Amino acid sequence: MAGNGVSTSADATWIGIGGVTSSDLIQTGTDDTVTASGQVSTIAFYELLPASETPIPSMTVSPGDAMSADIANLGGTAWRISLADVTRGETFSINVTYNSTLSTAEWIEEDPSFARGGLVPFDNFGLANFTGATATENGAVTTLTGAGAQAIIMENSHGQAIATPSVISSNGEGFSVTGGG
């Protein structure tokens, strides 16, 4: 990751349930913040919209750490959010209550928003890899390919790609996102 030389920038990498076709979203992942000079800090978080994200201070995440995430519906409005820093061997899990439409499953690399609205300047995160991406519904495991996953290219206000997903891997469970633009 490189600083832009002007201002603080950021990116977020997460998985979630809901949010594409509904206003509900339960998610967990990491946020990277990059100073103008290129100093990077990373935090782990979870979020239940419409509330703001909740940092996970018990996890010490470094930029580039391999992460594993799982969001499991335990029945009705009961959920378990699990996040692990595979590189460091740290884990976090919390049970929450949340009303979800279960409308979509998501694997996202994005430009986060300020709490007061508007987008944080987007950093050039390089490459984000997603592997083992599956969703389970009614006991049936579905891959990205099996679910008909749709790639979304993030563009800036000039129509230039700033985050571009790859094709889905041959096993149907992975892809990468390349930053820059």
Language model region names:
Residues 1-181:
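Exposed, interaction-prone regions of secreted/extracellular proteins
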